[in-house]
Amino acid sequence: MGSQVWVVSTLLISIVLIVLTIVKLKFHPFLALLLASFFVGAMMGMGPLEMVNAIESGIGGTLGFLAAVIGLGTILGKMMEVSGAAERIGLTLQRCRWLSADVIMVLVGLICGITLFVEVGVVLLIPLAFSIAKKTNTSLLKLAIPLCTALMAVHCVVPPHPAALFVANKLGADIGTVIVYGLLVGLIASLVGGPLFLRALGNRLPYKPVPAEFANLEVREASTLPSLGATLFTVLLPIGLMLVKTVAELNMEKGGTLYTVLEFIGNPITAMFIAVFVAYYMLGIRRQMGMGVLLTHTENGFGSIANILLIIGAGGAFNAILKSSGLADSLAVILSNLYMHPILLAWLVALILHAAVGSATVAMMGATAIVAPMLPLYPGVSPEIIAIAIGSGAIGCTIVTDSLFWLVKQYCGASLSETFKYYTTATFIASLLALAATFLLSFII
Protein backbone atom coordinates (compact mmCIF):
# COMPACT_ATOMS: atom_id res chain seq x y z
CA MET A 1 0.00 0.00 0.00
CA GLY A 2 2.84 2.35 0.90
CA SER A 3 4.52 1.85 -2.46
CA GLN A 4 1.26 2.60 -4.27
CA VAL A 5 0.86 5.85 -2.34
CA TRP A 6 4.45 6.76 -3.26
CA VAL A 7 3.84 6.06 -6.96
CA VAL A 8 0.60 8.05 -7.09
CA SER A 9 2.09 10.91 -5.07
CA THR A 10 5.13 11.07 -7.35
CA LEU A 11 2.96 11.23 -10.46
CA LEU A 12 0.56 13.81 -9.04
CA ILE A 13 3.38 16.03 -7.78
CA SER A 14 5.09 15.81 -11.18
CA ILE A 15 1.88 16.95 -12.89
CA VAL A 16 1.43 19.78 -10.38
CA LEU A 17 5.07 20.71 -11.00
CA ILE A 18 4.44 20.91 -14.75
CA VAL A 19 1.32 23.04 -14.24
CA LEU A 20 2.89 25.43 -11.73
CA THR A 21 6.10 25.96 -13.66
CA ILE A 22 4.22 26.69 -16.90
CA VAL A 23 1.32 28.74 -15.51
CA LYS A 24 2.86 30.51 -12.50
CA LEU A 25 6.61 30.61 -13.18
CA LYS A 26 6.16 31.03 -16.95
CA PHE A 27 8.59 28.22 -17.82
CA HIS A 28 8.60 27.03 -21.40
CA PRO A 29 6.83 23.61 -21.54
CA PHE A 30 10.10 22.05 -22.77
CA LEU A 31 11.84 23.03 -19.52
CA ALA A 32 8.82 22.14 -17.38
CA LEU A 33 8.62 18.62 -18.84
CA LEU A 34 12.35 18.04 -18.45
CA LEU A 35 12.20 19.23 -14.83
CA ALA A 36 9.31 16.87 -14.15
CA SER A 37 11.28 14.03 -15.79
CA PHE A 38 14.25 14.57 -13.47
CA PHE A 39 11.90 14.83 -10.50
CA VAL A 40 10.17 11.52 -11.27
CA GLY A 41 13.50 9.79 -11.87
CA ALA A 42 14.92 11.01 -8.56
CA MET A 43 11.77 10.12 -6.60
CA MET A 44 11.72 6.61 -8.09
CA GLY A 45 15.36 5.97 -7.18
CA MET A 46 16.98 6.20 -10.60
CA GLY A 47 20.68 7.05 -10.75
CA PRO A 48 21.81 10.34 -12.35
CA LEU A 49 23.30 8.70 -15.44
CA GLU A 50 20.32 6.36 -15.74
CA MET A 51 18.01 9.39 -15.82
CA VAL A 52 20.09 11.16 -18.45
CA ASN A 53 20.22 8.04 -20.64
CA ALA A 54 16.44 7.57 -20.38
CA ILE A 55 15.83 11.22 -21.29
CA GLU A 56 18.20 10.99 -24.26
CA SER A 57 16.54 7.83 -25.56
CA GLY A 58 13.08 9.31 -24.99
CA ILE A 59 13.81 12.46 -26.95
CA GLY A 60 15.65 10.61 -29.71
CA GLY A 61 13.08 7.85 -30.03
CA THR A 62 10.21 10.31 -30.24
CA LEU A 63 11.73 12.86 -32.60
CA GLY A 64 13.38 10.20 -34.76
CA PHE A 65 9.96 9.56 -36.27
CA LEU A 66 8.05 12.77 -35.63
CA ALA A 67 10.64 15.41 -36.57
CA ALA A 68 10.55 14.51 -40.26
CA VAL A 69 6.74 14.32 -40.38
CA ILE A 70 6.32 17.63 -38.56
CA GLY A 71 8.89 19.32 -40.79
CA LEU A 72 7.24 18.06 -43.96
CA GLY A 73 3.80 18.94 -42.63
CA THR A 74 5.01 22.46 -41.95
CA ILE A 75 6.05 22.87 -45.59
CA LEU A 76 2.65 21.61 -46.71
CA GLY A 77 0.87 24.03 -44.39
CA LYS A 78 3.05 26.91 -45.54
CA MET A 79 2.21 26.18 -49.17
CA MET A 80 -1.49 26.18 -48.26
CA GLU A 81 -1.01 29.55 -46.61
CA VAL A 82 1.03 31.43 -49.22
CA SER A 83 -0.87 30.07 -52.22
CA GLY A 84 -4.32 30.89 -50.84
CA ALA A 85 -5.41 27.24 -51.06
CA ALA A 86 -7.22 27.40 -47.72
CA GLU A 87 -9.20 30.43 -48.88
CA ARG A 88 -10.11 28.60 -52.10
CA ILE A 89 -11.79 25.87 -50.06
CA GLY A 90 -13.75 28.46 -48.08
CA LEU A 91 -14.87 30.43 -51.13
CA THR A 92 -15.99 27.23 -52.89
CA LEU A 93 -18.04 26.07 -49.91
CA GLN A 94 -19.70 29.50 -49.79
CA ARG A 95 -21.25 28.75 -53.18
CA CYS A 96 -23.04 25.70 -51.77
CA ARG A 97 -26.49 27.21 -51.21
CA TRP A 98 -27.65 24.25 -49.14
CA LEU A 99 -24.91 24.79 -46.54
CA SER A 100 -25.44 27.39 -43.82
CA ALA A 101 -22.60 29.77 -43.01
CA ASP A 102 -21.79 28.17 -39.65
CA VAL A 103 -21.60 24.67 -41.16
CA ILE A 104 -19.36 26.06 -43.91
CA MET A 105 -16.96 27.31 -41.24
CA VAL A 106 -16.87 23.84 -39.64
CA LEU A 107 -16.05 22.19 -42.96
CA VAL A 108 -13.41 24.81 -43.75
CA GLY A 109 -11.81 24.19 -40.36
CA LEU A 110 -11.87 20.41 -40.75
CA ILE A 111 -10.44 20.34 -44.28
CA CYS A 112 -7.88 23.12 -43.97
CA GLY A 113 -6.99 22.10 -40.43
CA ILE A 114 -5.48 18.85 -41.70
CA THR A 115 -2.36 20.72 -42.84
CA LEU A 116 -2.39 23.79 -40.55
CA PHE A 117 -1.42 24.24 -36.91
CA VAL A 118 -4.48 25.42 -35.03
CA GLU A 119 -3.26 28.96 -34.26
CA VAL A 120 -2.04 29.41 -37.84
CA GLY A 121 -5.39 28.14 -39.10
CA VAL A 122 -7.29 30.70 -37.02
CA VAL A 123 -5.15 33.62 -38.19
CA LEU A 124 -5.30 32.46 -41.81
CA LEU A 125 -9.02 31.66 -41.99
CA ILE A 126 -10.59 34.29 -39.74
CA PRO A 127 -10.75 36.81 -42.66
CA LEU A 128 -13.19 34.38 -44.31
CA ALA A 129 -15.39 34.56 -41.21
CA PHE A 130 -15.13 38.36 -41.31
CA SER A 131 -16.17 38.41 -44.97
CA ILE A 132 -19.21 36.17 -44.44
CA ALA A 133 -20.24 38.05 -41.28
CA LYS A 134 -20.23 41.39 -43.12
CA LYS A 135 -22.10 40.04 -46.15
CA THR A 136 -24.80 38.26 -44.14
CA ASN A 137 -24.96 40.60 -41.13
CA THR A 138 -24.33 37.58 -38.89
CA SER A 139 -22.82 37.70 -35.40
CA LEU A 140 -19.11 36.93 -35.69
CA LEU A 141 -19.42 34.53 -32.75
CA LYS A 142 -21.71 32.33 -34.87
CA LEU A 143 -18.93 31.89 -37.45
CA ALA A 144 -15.66 32.14 -35.53
CA ILE A 145 -16.57 29.64 -32.80
CA PRO A 146 -17.48 26.79 -35.24
CA LEU A 147 -14.27 27.51 -37.19
CA CYS A 148 -12.05 27.44 -34.10
CA THR A 149 -13.80 24.40 -32.63
CA ALA A 150 -13.26 22.45 -35.86
CA LEU A 151 -9.60 23.49 -36.07
CA MET A 152 -9.04 22.35 -32.47
CA ALA A 153 -10.82 19.04 -33.10
CA VAL A 154 -8.62 18.22 -36.10
CA HIS A 155 -5.53 19.34 -34.17
CA CYS A 156 -6.30 16.84 -31.39
CA VAL A 157 -7.65 13.75 -33.15
CA VAL A 158 -6.35 13.65 -36.74
CA PRO A 159 -2.78 12.70 -37.67
CA PRO A 160 -0.47 13.94 -39.13
CA HIS A 161 -0.97 16.71 -36.57
CA PRO A 162 1.99 16.43 -34.16
CA ALA A 163 0.10 15.70 -30.94
CA ALA A 164 -2.27 13.18 -32.56
CA LEU A 165 0.67 11.53 -34.31
CA PHE A 166 2.64 11.39 -31.05
CA VAL A 167 -0.23 9.64 -29.26
CA ALA A 168 -0.83 7.15 -32.09
CA ASN A 169 2.88 6.37 -32.29
CA LYS A 170 3.31 5.85 -28.52
CA LEU A 171 0.20 3.66 -28.26
CA GLY A 172 1.13 1.58 -31.31
CA ALA A 173 -2.08 2.59 -33.09
CA ASP A 174 -2.53 2.30 -36.84
CA ILE A 175 -2.30 5.84 -38.17
CA GLY A 176 -4.67 5.32 -41.10
CA THR A 177 -7.36 3.98 -38.80
CA VAL A 178 -6.88 6.88 -36.39
CA ILE A 179 -7.28 9.31 -39.31
CA VAL A 180 -10.64 7.79 -40.32
CA TYR A 181 -11.96 7.65 -36.75
CA GLY A 182 -10.58 11.10 -36.01
CA LEU A 183 -12.24 12.78 -38.99
CA LEU A 184 -15.58 11.16 -38.13
CA VAL A 185 -15.39 12.07 -34.44
CA GLY A 186 -14.08 15.55 -35.23
CA LEU A 187 -16.96 16.24 -37.62
CA ILE A 188 -19.62 15.15 -35.13
CA ALA A 189 -18.02 17.04 -32.25
CA SER A 190 -17.54 20.24 -34.26
CA LEU A 191 -21.08 20.32 -35.67
CA VAL A 192 -22.68 19.82 -32.26
CA GLY A 193 -20.26 21.96 -30.25
CA GLY A 194 -20.34 24.72 -32.86
CA PRO A 195 -23.47 25.30 -34.99
CA LEU A 196 -26.01 23.24 -32.99
CA PHE A 197 -25.00 24.68 -29.63
CA LEU A 198 -25.03 28.27 -30.90
CA ARG A 199 -28.37 27.79 -32.69
CA ALA A 200 -29.86 26.43 -29.47
CA LEU A 201 -28.96 29.73 -27.81
CA GLY A 202 -31.09 31.62 -30.34
CA ASN A 203 -31.41 35.31 -29.51
CA ARG A 204 -29.33 34.85 -26.36
CA LEU A 205 -26.21 34.80 -28.55
CA PRO A 206 -25.11 38.46 -28.72
CA TYR A 207 -24.48 40.16 -32.03
CA LYS A 208 -20.79 40.83 -32.55
CA PRO A 209 -19.74 42.79 -35.65
CA VAL A 210 -16.26 42.58 -37.12
CA PRO A 211 -14.00 44.60 -34.76
CA ALA A 212 -12.85 47.90 -36.25
CA GLU A 213 -9.16 46.98 -36.01
CA PHE A 214 -9.76 43.97 -38.29
CA ALA A 215 -12.11 45.66 -40.75
CA ASN A 216 -9.41 45.85 -43.42
CA LEU A 217 -8.65 42.11 -43.36
CA GLU A 218 -10.07 40.70 -46.57
CA VAL A 219 -10.09 37.37 -48.42
CA ARG A 220 -7.97 37.39 -51.58
CA GLU A 221 -9.63 37.64 -54.98
CA ALA A 222 -10.77 34.26 -56.32
CA SER A 223 -8.85 34.78 -59.56
CA THR A 224 -5.55 34.82 -57.66
CA LEU A 225 -6.17 31.52 -55.86
CA PRO A 226 -5.29 27.96 -56.96
CA SER A 227 -8.04 25.74 -58.34
CA LEU A 228 -10.21 23.66 -56.02
CA GLY A 229 -9.03 20.43 -57.65
CA ALA A 230 -5.36 21.24 -57.09
CA THR A 231 -6.08 22.31 -53.52
CA LEU A 232 -8.06 19.22 -52.50
CA PHE A 233 -5.65 16.86 -54.25
CA THR A 234 -2.73 18.38 -52.36
CA VAL A 235 -4.49 18.39 -48.97
CA LEU A 236 -5.92 14.88 -49.21
CA LEU A 237 -2.96 13.15 -50.90
CA PRO A 238 -0.98 12.29 -47.73
CA ILE A 239 -4.16 11.17 -45.96
CA GLY A 240 -5.04 8.95 -48.94
CA LEU A 241 -1.58 7.39 -49.07
CA MET A 242 -1.68 6.56 -45.36
CA LEU A 243 -5.14 5.03 -45.74
CA VAL A 244 -3.92 2.89 -48.64
CA LYS A 245 -1.26 1.48 -46.32
CA THR A 246 -3.91 0.62 -43.74
CA VAL A 247 -6.10 -1.10 -46.34
CA ALA A 248 -3.09 -3.10 -47.55
CA GLU A 249 -2.30 -4.26 -44.02
CA LEU A 250 -5.89 -5.42 -43.52
CA ASN A 251 -6.41 -7.17 -46.86
CA MET A 252 -3.06 -8.29 -48.30
CA GLU A 253 -0.50 -10.89 -47.38
CA LYS A 254 2.76 -9.47 -46.11
CA GLY A 255 5.92 -9.84 -48.14
CA GLY A 256 4.58 -9.31 -51.67
CA THR A 257 5.97 -6.64 -53.97
CA LEU A 258 2.73 -4.63 -54.11
CA TYR A 259 2.32 -4.86 -50.34
CA THR A 260 5.86 -3.55 -49.82
CA VAL A 261 5.28 -0.65 -52.23
CA LEU A 262 2.04 0.33 -50.50
CA GLU A 263 3.68 0.07 -47.08
CA PHE A 264 6.48 2.32 -48.31
CA ILE A 265 4.37 5.08 -49.86
CA GLY A 266 1.86 4.94 -46.99
CA ASN A 267 4.45 5.47 -44.28
CA PRO A 268 3.76 8.95 -42.83
CA ILE A 269 7.26 10.17 -43.67
CA THR A 270 7.06 8.99 -47.28
CA ALA A 271 3.45 10.15 -47.72
CA MET A 272 4.24 13.64 -46.46
CA PHE A 273 7.45 13.76 -48.53
CA ILE A 274 5.50 12.98 -51.71
CA ALA A 275 2.80 15.50 -50.78
CA VAL A 276 5.37 18.27 -50.30
CA PHE A 277 6.68 17.96 -53.85
CA VAL A 278 3.14 17.77 -55.19
CA ALA A 279 2.37 20.97 -53.26
CA TYR A 280 5.53 22.62 -54.61
CA TYR A 281 4.30 21.94 -58.14
CA MET A 282 0.51 22.31 -57.83
CA LEU A 283 0.47 25.32 -55.50
CA GLY A 284 3.82 26.86 -56.39
CA ILE A 285 5.68 26.16 -59.62
CA ARG A 286 2.48 25.91 -61.68
CA ARG A 287 1.56 29.36 -60.39
CA GLN A 288 4.88 30.95 -61.40
CA MET A 289 6.71 30.55 -58.08
CA GLY A 290 10.39 29.82 -58.64
CA MET A 291 12.41 27.41 -56.51
CA GLY A 292 14.09 30.38 -54.83
CA VAL A 293 10.72 31.64 -53.64
CA LEU A 294 9.71 28.15 -52.51
CA LEU A 295 12.98 27.85 -50.57
CA THR A 296 12.24 31.13 -48.79
CA HIS A 297 8.73 29.98 -47.87
CA THR A 298 10.13 26.65 -46.63
CA GLU A 299 12.72 28.34 -44.45
CA ASN A 300 10.10 30.72 -43.06
CA GLY A 301 7.90 27.75 -42.22
CA PHE A 302 10.68 25.90 -40.43
CA GLY A 303 11.21 28.86 -38.13
CA SER A 304 7.87 28.15 -36.45
CA ILE A 305 8.37 24.48 -35.56
CA ALA A 306 11.28 24.61 -33.09
CA ASN A 307 8.76 25.21 -30.31
CA ILE A 308 6.59 22.18 -31.07
CA LEU A 309 9.59 19.90 -31.70
CA LEU A 310 11.14 20.72 -28.33
CA ILE A 311 7.85 20.24 -26.48
CA ILE A 312 7.23 16.88 -28.14
CA GLY A 313 10.81 15.79 -27.51
CA ALA A 314 10.47 16.63 -23.82
CA GLY A 315 7.17 14.74 -23.76
CA GLY A 316 9.02 11.72 -25.10
CA ALA A 317 11.59 12.13 -22.33
CA PHE A 318 8.84 12.24 -19.68
CA ASN A 319 7.31 9.06 -21.10
CA ALA A 320 10.71 7.34 -21.13
CA ILE A 321 11.38 8.25 -17.49
CA LEU A 322 7.99 6.86 -16.43
CA LYS A 323 8.81 3.57 -18.15
CA SER A 324 12.45 3.28 -17.10
CA SER A 325 11.74 4.15 -13.46
CA GLY A 326 9.09 1.45 -13.15
CA LEU A 327 6.42 4.03 -12.33
CA ALA A 328 4.48 3.23 -15.50
CA ASP A 329 4.09 -0.46 -14.64
CA SER A 330 3.07 0.30 -11.05
CA LEU A 331 0.63 2.91 -12.28
CA ALA A 332 -0.98 0.42 -14.67
CA VAL A 333 -1.80 -1.90 -11.79
CA ILE A 334 -3.19 0.94 -9.67
CA LEU A 335 -5.36 2.34 -12.46
CA SER A 336 -6.75 -1.10 -13.26
CA ASN A 337 -8.16 -1.22 -9.72
CA LEU A 338 -10.09 2.02 -10.14
CA TYR A 339 -12.79 0.27 -12.18
CA MET A 340 -12.96 3.25 -14.52
CA HIS A 341 -13.29 2.50 -18.22
CA PRO A 342 -9.97 3.25 -19.99
CA ILE A 343 -11.74 5.40 -22.61
CA LEU A 344 -13.27 7.59 -19.90
CA LEU A 345 -9.98 7.73 -18.01
CA ALA A 346 -8.02 8.75 -21.12
CA TRP A 347 -10.57 11.47 -21.92
CA LEU A 348 -10.72 12.81 -18.36
CA VAL A 349 -6.95 13.01 -17.86
CA ALA A 350 -6.46 14.88 -21.17
CA LEU A 351 -9.36 17.24 -20.38
CA ILE A 352 -7.99 18.15 -16.94
CA LEU A 353 -4.43 18.56 -18.18
CA HIS A 354 -5.53 20.83 -21.04
CA ALA A 355 -7.43 23.07 -18.64
CA ALA A 356 -4.49 23.15 -16.23
CA VAL A 357 -1.58 23.58 -18.65
CA GLY A 358 -3.29 25.42 -21.51
CA SER A 359 -1.66 23.32 -24.22
CA ALA A 360 -3.55 20.52 -25.95
CA THR A 361 -0.22 19.09 -27.10
CA VAL A 362 1.25 18.88 -23.59
CA ALA A 363 -2.07 17.55 -22.26
CA MET A 364 -2.15 14.74 -24.82
CA MET A 365 1.45 13.75 -24.13
CA GLY A 366 0.83 13.71 -20.39
CA ALA A 367 -2.35 11.67 -20.79
CA THR A 368 -0.51 9.19 -23.00
CA ALA A 369 2.18 8.71 -20.35
CA ILE A 370 -0.48 8.00 -17.72
CA VAL A 371 -2.84 5.80 -19.74
CA ALA A 372 -0.47 3.81 -22.00
CA PRO A 373 0.85 1.46 -19.27
CA MET A 374 -2.61 0.09 -18.53
CA LEU A 375 -3.53 -0.78 -22.14
CA PRO A 376 -2.17 -4.37 -21.96
CA LEU A 377 -4.67 -4.98 -19.15
CA TYR A 378 -7.54 -4.16 -21.55
CA PRO A 379 -6.90 -6.19 -24.71
CA GLY A 380 -10.48 -5.60 -25.85
CA VAL A 381 -9.90 -1.85 -26.24
CA SER A 382 -7.94 -0.94 -29.35
CA PRO A 383 -5.09 1.59 -29.15
CA GLU A 384 -6.78 3.52 -31.96
CA ILE A 385 -9.83 4.11 -29.76
CA ILE A 386 -7.68 5.23 -26.82
CA ALA A 387 -5.80 7.62 -29.12
CA ILE A 388 -9.11 9.21 -30.14
CA ALA A 389 -10.26 9.33 -26.50
CA ILE A 390 -7.13 11.24 -25.47
CA GLY A 391 -7.58 13.68 -28.35
CA SER A 392 -11.27 14.08 -27.50
CA GLY A 393 -10.39 15.12 -23.97
CA ALA A 394 -7.85 17.67 -25.19
CA ILE A 395 -10.51 19.38 -27.34
CA GLY A 396 -12.35 20.56 -24.24
CA CYS A 397 -11.84 23.21 -21.59
CA THR A 398 -10.14 25.85 -23.70
CA ILE A 399 -9.83 28.52 -21.02
CA VAL A 400 -7.57 31.46 -20.13
CA THR A 401 -4.49 29.22 -19.93
CA ASP A 402 -4.76 28.52 -23.67
CA SER A 403 -3.57 31.08 -26.24
CA LEU A 404 -6.46 30.04 -28.51
CA PHE A 405 -8.92 31.42 -25.94
CA TRP A 406 -7.36 34.86 -26.27
CA LEU A 407 -7.23 34.66 -30.07
CA VAL A 408 -10.99 34.02 -30.19
CA LYS A 409 -11.65 36.80 -27.67
CA GLN A 410 -9.57 39.29 -29.64
CA TYR A 411 -10.85 38.46 -33.12
CA CYS A 412 -14.50 38.38 -32.01
CA GLY A 413 -14.31 41.54 -29.93
CA ALA A 414 -15.88 39.59 -27.07
CA SER A 415 -15.58 40.19 -23.33
CA LEU A 416 -13.87 37.68 -21.05
CA SER A 417 -17.20 36.40 -19.71
CA GLU A 418 -18.65 36.08 -23.23
CA THR A 419 -15.64 34.08 -24.41
CA PHE A 420 -16.04 31.75 -21.43
CA LYS A 421 -19.80 31.47 -21.89
CA TYR A 422 -19.79 30.72 -25.61
CA TYR A 423 -16.37 29.49 -26.75
CA THR A 424 -15.25 27.53 -23.67
CA THR A 425 -18.71 25.94 -23.45
CA ALA A 426 -18.57 25.07 -27.17
CA THR A 427 -15.24 23.27 -26.76
CA PHE A 428 -16.52 21.38 -23.70
CA ILE A 429 -19.66 20.25 -25.54
CA ALA A 430 -17.53 19.22 -28.53
CA SER A 431 -15.29 17.24 -26.18
CA LEU A 432 -18.29 15.47 -24.60
CA LEU A 433 -19.72 14.59 -28.01
CA ALA A 434 -16.31 13.32 -29.12
CA LEU A 435 -16.21 11.11 -26.02
CA ALA A 436 -19.69 9.75 -26.78
CA ALA A 437 -18.74 9.11 -30.41
CA THR A 438 -15.57 7.33 -29.28
CA PHE A 439 -17.56 5.05 -26.98
CA LEU A 440 -19.99 4.34 -29.83
CA LEU A 441 -17.12 3.47 -32.16
CA SER A 442 -15.66 1.10 -29.56
CA PHE A 443 -18.95 -0.83 -29.47
CA ILE A 444 -19.36 -0.96 -33.25
CA ILE A 445 -15.87 -2.01 -34.35
Where are the model-predicted features located?
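Structural signature of hydrophobic alpha-helical transmembrane segments
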Residues: 2-11, 62-71, 117-121, 184-187, ...
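Hydrophobic alpha-helical transmembrane segments
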Residues: 8-13, 31-34, 67, 102-107, ...
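Membrane-embedded alpha-helical segments and adjacent helix-loop junctions characteristic
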Residues: 48-135, 288-375
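Alpha-helical transmembrane segments of multi-pass membrane proteins
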Residues: 99-114, 137-156, 174-187, 342-354, ...
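Membrane-core helix-loop-helix motifs of multi-pass transport proteins
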Residues: 131-239, 405-441
